[in-house]
Swiss-Prot record:
Compartments where located: Cytoplasm
Protein name: Elongation factor G
PROSITE patterns, alphabetized: G_TR_1, G_TR_2
Cystine pairings recorded for this chain: none
């Protein structure tokens, strides 16, 4: 089957924003203008097409990033048809994993900001993720019709909070109730959208009186930013004082793709203004798969190789999301980087060393689907029939393997015990949790060996709440959940030398003998565990060294204070002895474990607790109450900023253990007028009284 859209006209983009910036509404409008939706879905009434899980429609927030394909010929329908693959990403901080996954497979992103709220904490997280994957992006300032809307304030916030380099290519005509359209700074014309056609039609008009000065000032800034793309353009700009529309577009495109600038637009998705111009900007400034560097990976010998975005190259793709679909079973969303894949053919998974057959290939549109015969370089689609692929793994041609860079996922910070309401559901719950864990790498399931309880762990209270909710809705398993438990860690503060571990058993016949001498010392936070073999002269034979390391690693999950996992410790094997007959791997494993535990006890062990970055937005009247409450939760208030339109933003670092049920108490303290966001920051040593309480509670 021939390619219907040349790859140069593909745009794989994400739409990303803080909660309530109007991202789902923006996506809905895109689907409407590109002709996919004939009735606009509103988030307010729970009918938005992209939010297709029941919980999302109830909560009015987007949880899973649905992938949608649509087509655009430009606002005035004068361009050749471009194909947009849009990934809708969640804005809630408990779902940053979804954002991270989608960033990995996007070529460009559109950041949506609220004209009133501006750049919020979650926006900063998303921005950092986009920087990490070097994703070119545009900014769209939404909700220009709201009271307190201020486009230029958001421009400033992008510079100060995100250290971004925004370049407005439009400026608003009016704001709040009087927002009527935008001035296109390239054409120096006003764009006014026709309300009767829900913004499908528009007209170019003269710039309203009184706006020419502002438009001229921002046009000069835009042309200057374009001129910096090359020496040649800069010279022309210095000589003539201007550049042509095509020169500006091309120069801004070059600099956007290089992540040097971010073109900026504005509008109100809800009132059908501005999204159309943003779609044109996606074509003008964001890259196609061939505009970005070839994807890199490693071959079977761990040598670096790359693949160009070309149908003639060997097939390579990344599985970036798994979903369980009630009708077809497991869907594996893939981004194809090179080559072509037909339904019914086989692919190779180099990470598992396994070959798998693709059953069907589905082109997704939110929650509707269309079966297609093949996918080509640059495509994003869902495959049915893959049994053993998990998120972040590569699929490639059997004859020329490539392993694309694996994604790194954060460790969960909160755990809860969960049990089915009826014993009969035990097995069903196991299957349900297994499926949900396969879909979401930031969610873990394990069985507590001592209590036999099933423990689920995730990125926050809302994350686990939604998992339990999905278990009930999708798998029919009702569960009771225990009190949330914090993921504490243990580490040490002192260096201890010459710690001995000796395991000797003599019970007639062959005995056991292992003897090690260790140095145990703390490492930098986040450095993890390190083992160093410093044995000289074979006092511990070579073949037993791996057993020593294994003994140490097996001891890490259970610390000496309260049985929490041990982190950031370095252990050096310095000396030891062995017995010709009685020494074996098991004896050295036991000796290493005993020595390590003894070393931990002597090296000033401490408990570490997860600290959260908390931001509370509150009316000024309650600022004192909120700060007092955060301090009473052992929080360190780090600053307070003014919010536009009144109110304060309070930033603090608070232990996670003190934040349970915070949303309820914040609501009652501020009569429901304050909101907060929270995300994991780092681990920090728990004060002695807190550590003692944790140890006592664990000992019961």
């Amino acid at each position: 089957m021939a390619r219907q859209t040349p790859i140069e006209r593909y745009r794989n983009i994400g739409i990303s924003a803080h909660i309530d910036a109007g991202k789902t509404t923006t996506t809905e409008r895109i689907l409407y203008y590109t002709g996919v939706n004939h009735k606009i879905g509103e988030v307010h009434d729970g009918a938005a097409t992209m939010d297709w899980m029941e919980q999302e429609q109830e909560r009015g927030i987007t949880i899973t990033s649905a992938a949608t394909t649509c087509f655009w010929k430009g606002m005035d329908r004068s361009l050749p048809e471009h194909r947009f693959n849009i990934i809708d990403t969640p804005g809630h901080v408990d779902f940053t994993i979804e954002v991270e996954r989608s960033m990995r497979v996007l070529d460009g992103a559109c950041m949506v900001y609220c004209a009133v709220g501006g750049v919020q904490p979650q926006s900063e997280t998303v921005w950092r993720q986009a920087n990490k994957y070097k994703v070119p992006r545009l900014a769209f300032v939404n909700k220009m019709d709201r009271t307190g809307a201020n486009f230029f304030k958001v421009v400033d916030q992008m510079k100060t909070r995100l250290r971004a380099n925004p370049v407005p290519v439009v400026v608003p005509i009016g704001a709040e109730d009087s927002f009527t359209g935008v001035v296109d700074l390239l054409k120096m014309k006003a764009i006014i959208w026709d309300e009767a056609s829900q913004g499908m039609k528009f007209s170019y008009e003269d710039i309203p009186a009184g706006l020419e000065g502002v438009a001229q000032e921002w046009r000069e800034k835009m042309v200057e930013a374009a001129a910096e793309a090359s020496e040649e353009l800069m010279n022309k700009y210095l000589e003539t004082g201007d550049l042509t529309e095509d020169e500006i577009k091309l120069a801004l495109r070059t600099r956007t793709i290089a992540c040097e600038i971010q073109p900026m637009l504005c509008g109100t998705a809800f009132k059908n203004k501005g999204v159309q111009r943003m779609l044109d900007a996606v074509i003008d400034y964001l890259p196609s798969p061939v505009d970005i560097p070839p994807v890199t990976g490693t071959d079977d010998d761990d040598q670096p190789i790359s693949r160009r975005a070309d149908d003639k190259e060997k097939f390579s793709a990344l599985a970036f999301k798994l979903m369980t679909d009630p009708f077809v079973g497991q869907l594996t969303f893939v981004r194809v980087y090179s080559g072509v894949l037909q339904s019914g053919s086989s692919v190779y998974n180099p990470i598992r060393g396994k070959k798998e057959r693709i059953g069907r290939i589905l082109q997704m549109h939110a929650n509707q689907r269309e079966e297609i015969k093949e996918i080509l370089a640059g495509d994003i689609a869902a495959c049915v029939g893959l049994k053993e692929v998990t998120t972040g793994e590569t699929l490639c041609d059997i004859d020329s393997p490539i392993t694309l860079v694996k994604m790194i996922f954060p460790e969960p910070v909160i755990s809860q015990a969960v049990e089915p309401k009826t014993k009969a559901d035990q097995e069903k719950m196991g299957i349900a949790l297994g499926r949900l864990a396969a879909e979401d790498p930031s969610f873990r399931v394990r069985t507590d060996e001592e209590s036999g309880q099933t423990i689920i762990s995730g990125m926050g209270e809302l994350h686990l709440e939604i998992i339990v909710d999905r278990m009930k809705r999708e798998f029919g398993v009702e569960a009771n959940v225990g009190k949330p438990q914090v993921a504490y860690r243990e580490t040490i503060r002192d260096l201890v030398k010459d710690v001995e571990g000796k395991f000797v058993r003599q019970s007639g016949g062959k005995g056991q003998y292992g003897h090690v001498v260790l140095t145990v010392e703390p490492q930098e936070p986040g450095a993890g565990f390190q083992f160093v073999d410093a044995i000289k002269g074979g006092v511990v034979p070579r073949e037993f060294i791996p057993a020593v390391e294994k003994g140490l690693i097996d001891t890490l999950p259970n610390g000496v204070l309260a049985g929490f996992p041990v982190v950031d410790v370095k252990v050096t094997l310095t000396f030891g002895s062995y017995h010709e007959v009685d020494s074996n791997e098991n004896a050295f494993k036991m000796a290493a474990s005993m020595g390590f535990k003894d070393g931990m006890r002597k090296a000033k062990p401490v408990i570490l607790e997860p600290m959260m970055a908390v931001e509370v937005e509150t009316p000024e009247d309650y600022a004192g109450t909120v700060m007092g409450d955060l301090s009473s939760r052992r929080g360190m208030v780090q600053g307070m900023d003014d919010m536009v339109g009144g109110g304060k933003v309070i930033k603090a670092e608070v232990p996670l253990s003190e934040m349970f049920g915070y949303s309820t108490s914040l609501r009652s303290a501020t009569q429901g007028r304050a909101t907060y966001t929270m995300e994991f920051k780092h681990y920090s040593e728990a004060p002695k009284n807190v550590a003692d309480a944790i140890i006592t509670a664990r000992g019961k």
